[in-house]
């Protein structure tokens, strides 16, 4: 049966691949992003703009009568020293990555019924934070926790909710990540070392289509688990960390990403 699927950030990377997979499946896909496209099924707005999001989702819901699947994929990354990051950039990241998720969910729920699904794209970094990526990790951690709460809150309505935590994926996400390289004598070269460590994994990252295909198959399940980790390495790591003291885990991660000055 044809489904109405709404994807934020659906014009690039994982979002675009998901759009293509659902369209190939015969579903009607509506995308929301800041890009301006000549496509009647695309809506150009920032998910951080609450009023615009409500207008777009209302238009979709009124036209089709219902929304079967909402995928909150819009977001961007940031790295830098927390002490030195511009607060406006931090607020902008939280507005897009976290508040944008809330805005779309609040607007869409009234068009969603029993059997519909909300899929929030979080990140493996919500589970395994690394130095100098704390703002992004905390935003994705908030998305993960929100998903857990909504799974309970919406269960009586028959709405399935899950969070997807992908590991390293080869998209323009890393290239487009806001990178603040300002440092001082308190941090020395640690930021540079951590950035180099992260960027050095580029060739080892999972392809976007591979990640999207795994997510697509998950969404096709009738019942959804509270969250899914994409990437065997990260699933194994998650299992191992359940039996590892948090202080030990943080110390190991810190050493891998620059450690001390």
Model-identified regions with their sequence ranges:
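Residue(s) in the substrate-gating loop at a strand-loop-helix junction
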Residues: 123
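SDR active-site lid
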Residues: 156-225
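Active-site helix of classical SDR
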Residues: 105, 139-142
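A short, exposed helix-loop element centered on a Lys and neighboring polar residues
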Residues: 105-106, 148
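Conserved glycine-rich cofactor-binding loop
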Residues: 11-12
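Substrate-binding pocket helix/loop in short-chain dehydrogenase/reductase
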Residues: 81-82, 86-91
